[in-house]
Amino acid sequence: DSDSAFLIG
């Protein structure tokens, strides 16, 4: 999901 993108980068 879109929340996961900020957790990675």
UniProtKB/Swiss-Prot annotation:
Stimulates sperm respiration and motility. This is [Phe6]-mosact.
